[in-house]
C-alpha cells in the first residue's frame, strides 16, 4: 500500500517523531494510523528502557513563584546540547506548571509525566529524568537563576531587593545552613574530632591545641552557614552583620544545581583510541 504525504504529516503531528520514522511505521502497518502510533509508543518505551542506564547529569533548574510559596525543579538529560532543546525545555516547563499548581510529590510527578518522558527519550535519543522537586513556603521570598544550571529561593523578613541579593549570594557561595547554630550536632562532632586529631599531630601543647580547635570550629560553622559567610556584596561584613544593620532576617533558603551528587562517567578518550587501534591490529 502506498503511503501518502498527508498520512506521514498526520502521524508526525500526532507523535512528534521524524518524517522517515513516521513513513516507516505506516509502511509496516499498511497505513493503519492507530496501529502505527501504538507500535511507535512501544518502540519508544523500549528505547527509553535502553537509555535508562545512561547517566543524565546535565539539564536545567526551573523556578516558579506561587502565592506564599515557590517551587524549584531539576530535570536532567545527558548533554548540554539537549538541555537547550525546545522540546526538552517544553517538557520541563510542563512538569513545573503541574508542580506549582498542585504541590504534588516527586513520585506523582514522575508517574504523571512518564508517558511524555518516554516519548521525549525516543524523539531526542537521550535519557531524561525528573530528578528533584522542592517546595519552600514564605510570605516574602525572592528567587534567582544563574543561567540554566543553578536556582535559589530565599525567604525571610526583608524587602524583595535584599532577598534577591541574598539569593545571588547563596548561588555563588553555596551555604548549607542559615545560621552557624543550625549546623547539625553530628556534623559538628565529626569536624571537631578531625580538628583535634590534626592539632595533636601538629604537636601543639594541649591548651594551645584546644584554643586552635575552638577557633577552627567557629570558622568551619561560619563558612557553611549563610549568616556566617562574608557577604559578596560587601565582603568586609558577614551576611549576619548585613542583616542586622538592615533589621532583616532570613528564615530559609533552597539551592539546587544541575547534576550535583550525580557520579559522572569519566571518558578516557586516549585509552579508548588505543584500545580501538589494538583491536584493529588483531583483526
From Swiss-Prot:
GO terms for cellular component: cytoplasm. GO terms for molecular function: translation elongation factor activity. Keywords: Cytoplasm, Elongation factor, Protein biosynthesis. It is found in: Cytoplasm. GO terms for biological process: translational elongation. Gene3D superfamilies: 1.10.286.20, DNA helicase RuvA subunit, C-terminal domain, Elongation factor Ts, dimerisation domain. Residues 79-82 are annotated as: Involved in Mg(2+) ion dislocation from EF-Tu. Signal peptide: none annotated. HAMAP family: EF_Ts. NCBIfam families: tsf. Associates with the EF-Tu.GDP complex and induces the exchange of GDP to GTP. It remains bound to the aminoacyl-tRNA.EF-Tu.GTP complex up to the GTP hydrolysis stage on the ribosome. Belongs to the EF-Ts family. This is Elongation factor Ts. It comes from Shewanella oneidensis (strain ATCC 700550 / JCM 31522 / CIP 106686 / LMG 19005 / NCIMB 14063 / MR-1).
Amino acid at each position: 500500500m502506498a503511503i501518502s504525504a498527508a498520512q506521514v504529516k498526520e502521524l508526525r503531528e500526532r507523535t512528534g517523531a521524524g518524517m522517515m520514522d513516521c513513513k516507516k511505521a505506516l509502511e509496516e502497518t499498511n497505513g493503519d494510523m492507530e496501529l502505527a502510533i501504538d507500535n511507535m509508543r512501544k518502540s519508544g518505551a523500549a528505547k527509553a528502557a535502553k537509555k535508562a542506564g545512561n547517566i543524565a547529569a546535565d539539564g536545567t533548574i526551573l523556578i516558579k513563584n506561587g502565592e506564599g510559596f515557590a517551587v524549584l525543579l531539576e530535570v536532567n538529560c545527558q548533554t548540554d546540547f539537549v538541555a537547550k532543546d525546545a522540546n526538552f525545555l517544553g517538557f520541563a516547563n510542563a512538569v513545573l506548571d503541574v508542580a506549582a499548581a498542585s504541590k504534588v510529590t516527586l513520585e506523582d510527578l514522575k508517574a504523571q509525566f512518564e508517558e511524555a518522558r518516554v516519548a521525549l527519550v525516543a524523539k531526542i535519543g537521550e535519557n531524561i529524568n525528573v530528578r528533584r522537586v522542592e517546595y519552600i513556603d514564605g510570605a516574602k521570598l525572592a528567587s534567582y537563576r544563574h543561567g540554566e544550571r543553578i536556582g535559589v529561593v530565599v525567604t525571610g523578613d526583608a524587602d524583595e531587593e535584599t532577598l534577591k541579593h541574598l539569593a545571588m549570594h547563596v548561588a555563588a557561595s553555596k551555604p548549607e545552613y542559615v545560621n552557624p547554630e543550625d549546623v547539625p550536632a553530628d556534623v559538628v562532632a565529626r569536624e571537631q574530632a578531625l580538628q583535634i586529631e590534626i592539632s595533636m599531630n601538629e604537636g601543639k601543647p594541649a591548651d594551645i591545641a584546644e584554643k586552635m580547635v575552638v577557633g577552627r570550629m567557629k570558622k568551619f560553622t561560619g563558612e557553611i552557614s549563610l549568616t556566617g559567610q562574608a557577604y559578596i556584596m560587601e565582603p568586609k561584613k558577614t551576611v549576619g552583620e548585613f542583616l542586622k544593620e538592615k533589621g532583616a532576617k532570613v528564615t530559609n533558603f533552597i539551592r539546587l544545581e544541575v547534576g550535583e551528587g550525580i557520579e559522572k562517567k569519566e571518558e578516557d578518550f586516549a585509552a579508548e583510541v588505543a584500545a580501538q587501534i589494538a583491536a584493529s591490529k588483531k583483526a
